[in-house]
């Protein structure tokens, strides 16, 4: 009886034209706390696949506009997951060594700090000026797998503004930082420039 009742409320189904009430309730709850520029929810399996979906969205956005943009920019020492897209944008080769020859086209930049912010901005702007960058993916404020390497919101905000000026999709990987772990609902809220896409997973399930 319990299984039958559950099946009537929570269908195990791909959301391609289908949905169910628990998913609708969760989507509405998320929309109530996400930054105001977030308008859509896309459900995936886990943190790694949420990153893959975000990268595909960014690449398809430019494809649909007729722009030949296929490069992704990510931070050095970042970690975004174990699926191929997520590994491509991760910077820790200890996890990715055997697969690196098959990755997406990714350019990695240093994490900005007080000492290098100007040089990082110059490098970032130079890369974006080539007009082949589709997206910039980052872990806001802290790189968890890199031994909790922190960076300041003011420096990240400067990069996000530069990306916006070049029509680059900003992707915040908040799989680790989301849902109050940094003192706000989302680490992205410490910046004045909101990401175009936010990836969530941990603490959601």
Task: Give names to the regions the model predicted.
Residues 1-205:
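Conserved N-terminal phosphate-binding loop of PLP-dependent enzymes in the Aspartate aminotransferase
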